[in-house]
């Protein structure tokens, strides 16, 4: 079959079609060829069908790019085990295949599939499952191979008789090899079970006489745990428990003849090395005995008693504690009298306990002995009086007294209450009430710190009322609020009230005077109110009104107002007549303007419009309608002036929440110049809600369409699609679509399109897992500008490995991306760690931090820190910091190296190496950039030598050599000093002759002009010396008094020449203990001092050395400007458990100091802290610290004095359930701050977080909680400093309503809706709240015929003058008893609320009342009339009451 078409048109020049097919029983095929201009399409298909094998193929050739050659094949062959089912698809160069094979035989089954595709990760995937039940061992094997990665699970086992053997092999850590074995021997009545995995094993064995459990784990604290229970006799047992080296044994033996038990316990725990208990109980005599010992401290308890109608029990407790050597206790309980008494006392102290309760009250007494002062508490409480006293040694409550008295007389009631703390009265209350005299008096005083508060209330009938609230604070003085009311005349019928109100809390203080005059004696009631808020400002209100008692549906009133500024509404009058609800009239006059209204006025409907005689005055609408007939509703409300009215209407059919057809509108008073009108219709079919509608607002109009809303309540998910068109600029076409899923996740996807501008919200928190997760949230809103129009946040973590962890957070803002990644790997004991932090920020740039350290061996420890930052300008900032420490018995090395690309400091190195064998050698120094300072020091038995190199001009190299011989009678010191080509030498000799005489000689040569040559020699005898002195060309000979001191290791010579300036030569040398390493405290090892003619030079070497510490300090000063001071200090503890190290170097004004601290802590922990400061840089000291204590990790970082932060963290359950720790910030006064964070997963889709922070300052605490589930988020923060704060984001949908909320503290965005659809009641409630401003629309109508009806339409808004509008009513008529209540709320300040209430009994009488409340002014008509009808007449009384002091009573017959 073929078809050809040729035309002259370019669009369709040629069209040809040809088709052929073959149709046989075994094979069917068809081919279709289409030619369109120069494009050719070929489609072919074949089909082979049979009961055991079939094959379907389809092939297409098209000119479309990407689909030029397509092939599809689907086949099955139940006789082909390798390809039971096969599907192959190829599109151009892309091929997909899926092949399923397998077979089932007796006790053998195999299933497998292969998948090939061009998709990444699935190019080649194979799955094989095999079950073999043919042998005694049953086997199950499952394997999955993807991209060459093979994961296999093998299960094998056997179950023969009463024996089970199960084996499992998996690729999962902890379950690589898993075995379970169980055996049950019924004849021996025994059971044995065993379970093993890669890291541990557990076994359980038991029979009727014993039960044994044994477990081995890889954990250090529970390497081996076992317990065993054995029955040793009738009623006798032995139990033993062990954990590593800790154990406990329990034995209990029963004496059948005496019905008693003996109990023995022995154990060994850390802290309780020996614990033993022995006990006995005799059930017949009600006697008990218990003896125990902890670390040889024995405690014994014995007791006996009787149980009848009364319970008596006595007990004696003997303890090793001083104040409780022997304690005797007695318990008595009388059930009939409901009385109980417990009393205990000690023979060795004042300890006493009494607790007694009976019908008359409660009595308690407690004395807790203490060497400083006992603590004593006494309590006596009855209904009419009570007293509580406490005395203690604690400052906050050294003396406490609370006492009360109550007197309940027939006509008079009095009460008083007082509380005193530490001798100061903090609370006092007096109350008195006298009913016959109509007197009430209340006085309350409170004292808190220096604040005194007084509350006073006093009333005497209608003649006097006083109220006072006063507060006295020394800082602010006295402030009070006071009201004084004085009455006169025959109140409440006729009289006056004078009112004075004072308020000094406000600034300035304010006094208000008011007078109220009432006359209720005449037919026309009069009320006059005069108010003076301040001097010369008087407001007067005169009200006269009358209402016909026989026809209360009509009446009139007159109100005259006098104000200081003569307002136009000084005179107000009016009348009303609502006898005929369908033709009601209301008239009232304000000033010269009269308003009239006429129309229908009922609770269900009103057509009233208030119009004025003044053409310029606006009409006022008082219109409403509330009608309902089945599913049809007609609600309308229109209130307010013509230019500012509010409107709400809703008409249509509401079958249920899923089937609605309505039209409505609303206008929010003056805030909306036009009415917003709308129509809406939606319905539900097959679980999908669809709808449409229109809207109009002024010149704007449009339509909308709900394409679908499909919700799955069980899975807590839904999808929706909505669109709208309008003539609003930039919003001609708007569409919203998306879905949400809260089933074990938080997934929200919303797309909003407005005239081609697309906004998107994509939140995917589906991976809530404590060990690993990856969650994303994306928001795309073009209105936010190019920077934030698209925001995407991804947070992930991996804590699945016990030692290797990572955290990642990525944030994308528009085209920029910021992230932070942290990874670390550490040892089990945290002795070693490698980690890095990588981050990118649009504000800080890119930075990378690498940290590595090894503290496993403090004798060979090192740490490295690498820092690299690229700023937003492209500049790179980087540095490396390395620290090493090595030590042996006779050698110590410390080195710290700093390298950076900083211009101020590119390189720095500080080091100190020491050898302390027979000769002590020290090599230390400091390098920075191209400058170096080094010191080589050698200490021998009689010699000290050193070389100092510096970068300072003139001091490039300094060499010093000191030789001492200070033993014997002849002493000498030789010193040489060389700085460049400048040399100085010093020789001193001293000879002693006996104890009182001797000679000395000193020679000094220097390159300094002031002392190129110095020679001193002399002889002394009995502290008198003859001296020869020569300095350069100055020569002197003199006699004088000499002060000479000499010992085995030192000498000190000083004398005063005629010039008066002292000359002193001193030297000391004692280094043997230092070389031997036997010192234990700092001492002077060597010194040399020289003073002459006001010049001085001092040198000293201090130190000591032993196996635990090396301390060396060199200190030199001179009066010469070139070398004022040199200081070097090395202090290093060699103890590997705890050590402090210090390195200090000072050369004139140059300083460099390093302080290190290291200590071992409990549970194989440690802490290391280093502080570095130098004049090389203006930066303050740098402080770095890290450590571990058990599971707690500690980090310190800071700069300068007290400008450091120490932070520690301790994981809970390997950080799976939370963490805790401490924080020290001394710079702001917070030390020892403790925090605790708990997070848990109560359900699959619940996350709960709780944070507690103890500021360790006057008990201040901070608490915060966070809860996430499928309905939203709740969070709370409580702090004495920050206050209480809360955050809420919730939503809930139910068949009868919905709720949504987003809130922070008192600021809320809320929307709540409810639907009531019952047989007799229908209603709708919509509630909204925006930042504390509440909106509410509440409607309800319920009818049960003439017996009962109720209805309401209430509108709450935050708008001024329209806070509450609408009304409500209830009506009931049962057995001729009528109860009715109605309220009307108007948008008016003069008449905001009108309330009416009726309660009548019409059963052969008219008994009840009718109440009308207009703006707080209440009118009540009470009647009590007896009779059967109006024609026969009624007998009784009518009374009329108002809130104005008046009453009218009419009695008689009618």
UniProtKB/Swiss-Prot annotation:
Subcellular localization, per the record?
Answer: Secreted
- Give the CC-aspect GO terms: extracellular region
N-terminal signal peptide:
none
Q: Which residues form the propeptide?
A: 1-197
Protein name (record): Beta-1,3-glucan-binding protein
Q: Which family does it belong to?
A: Belongs to the glycosyl hydrolase 16 family.
> Could you confirm whether the keyword ATP-binding appears in this record?
no
Q: In which tissues is it expressed?
A: Expressed in the hepatopancreas and secreted into the hemolymph. Expressed at lower levels in muscle, pleopod and gill tissue.
Q: Does the keyword Glycosyltransferase apply?
A: no
Coarse class of the primary localization is secreted
GO molecular function terms listed in the Swiss-Prot or TrEMBL record: pattern recognition receptor activity
Record: glycosylation sites: 33, 55, 185, 571, 592, 825, 882, 1153
Q: Quaternary structure per UniProt?
A: Monomer.
- Species of origin reads Penaeus vannamei
Q: What is the lineage of its organism?
A: Eukaryota, Metazoa, Ecdysozoa, Arthropoda, Crustacea
**Role played:** Involved in the recognition of invading microorganisms. Binds specifically to beta-1,3-glucan and activates the prophenoloxidase cascade.
Task: Give GO BP annotations, semicolon-separated.
Answer: cell surface pattern recognition receptor signaling pathway; innate immune response; lipid transport; regulation of innate immune response
The UniProt keywords, alphabetically, are: Glycoprotein, Immunity, Innate immunity, Lipid transport, Secreted, Transport
